[in-house]
Amino acid sequence: MNKINFTSKSTIIFLMLFLLFNTSFSQNVPVLKITDLKKRIENNSDTTYIVNFWATWCSPCVKELPDFDSISKIYKDDKVKVLLVTMDFKEEVKSKVLPFILAKKLYSEVLLLDEVNGNYFIPKISKEWSGAIPATLIVNNAYNFRHFFEKKLTYELLKTEIESVESKIKKK
């Protein structure tokens, strides 16, 4: 009887920890609408935002994520912020996105864009964007810097873009 009691208690504790673990991680992937994302990146701060649009099922996207993470780590003490905006479905946060983030050990901030109408949200990011991913917007509003890329980016190109913003800052 004691053995069954101990097993039942262990199961209950395990389930409680499992639920707590899952809940805390789901809070680490904020679900945003395009208006929320735009408010975040279109403020007048002198922070340079590197906003990468990707998905767990997109092979070129997955291949470039380590470069974005490297940039995020290198510039962690500077006014450079990498935002990895996944285009996965919000219903897949726990089943796909979180396990992916943990498996890849992503350092950068991950957000989920909860939009289904591409005709609505795509032009709000860039009129140049067809909707294909990977896509990246690099923006610094204080210095009128805005570059959009609809392709896989390399570490070298990301570093060059950041240096371009920094040179504008030094000129002012």
Q: Where on the chain are the PLM-derived regions?
A:
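Short, internal strand/loop/helix patches
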Residues: 100-133
